[in-house]
């Protein structure tokens, strides 16, 4: 059944039959509009996008390409094309320093790059492999950055902590840097889980990881882990009761309220209910809420503007809620929307980006 899982993942990474949307998407009774951006065509699901302000951002895909925009997504410049590399995640500390993770070998076809993490110090013009102490990291699926405020010689300053996890299909590994990415350490999480998909750190020490219990999808449950010691140890805070399930992506619009997408790969087409895990106590406990009763809506990305208003991407469409997940309405976010990033500028204005087969901007 592991091969069944790989085939399904490959379909949503390389299928060329995805529909294209070009019409602005205006949420009902909402000022926010999702607008499709013009980008280089890609025959499948692209995985991550990151912005440091309203204008400057980057996205990556499985063709080993990294693109940058300086005008809020109106135009994109290809900064890197690395054959044999499948980029899976990207994050930037500032306009110069950034990191891109790869899914690694022995998962998708034609992937030969064994380097799991790359770093740029010049805004993406050049990228170099990151060295680290600890066990070999096969691949990464997510990166999160925490800025810790402290007093430096009488002035407010920041320390930057960077966390990364992976991968889909196993093995499960964790990477961390506490010095702005200058040095890294890795550790195995195979005793806690078998797959890792996303990470959200609330501060230097506390956070959660989206995981799965088994690399065999037929036996896998969705799993959420929590740490209070910067990833040195983890405890289970949620596990689904059904087979063929994993978690995928996480969104915390506030300190206490958080949401995690639950993926179902059950081949039984009569199993239709899609679910999301929700916490109201900062990730200590979780409850399942229903998304939609359709078997063709496997979940991917999730992003919330506030505690109640959020979006989910699925294989077939997007969904929006304005009441904390009690009800959902179908919207167009393109297909296989894998990552939704929601930001606020200095004036409190909300903007965001989503990436899947296509890129969309929320403003």
Where are these regions (language model features)?
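Short glycine/acidic-enriched loop and turn motifs that connect beta-strands
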Residues: 105-109, 168-171, 214-217, 265-269, ...
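Asp-box/BNR beta-propeller loop motif
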Residues: 24-38, 64-80, 116-133, 175-188, ...
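Blade-level signature of beta-propeller repeat domains, shared across WD40, Kelch, NHL, RCC1
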Residues: 341-363
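Repeated scaffold domains used in trafficking and secretory/extracellular systems
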Residues: 46-48, 86-90, 138-145, 194-200, ...
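Bacterial Sec-dependent N-terminal signal peptides
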Residues: 1-23
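Recurrent small/Gly-Pro-centered beta-turn motifs in extracellular repeat architectures
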Residues: 61, 101-104, 164-167, 210-213, ...
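Entry beta-strands of beta-propeller and related beta-repeat scaffolds
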Residues: 56-58, 97-100, 157-164, 205-209, ...
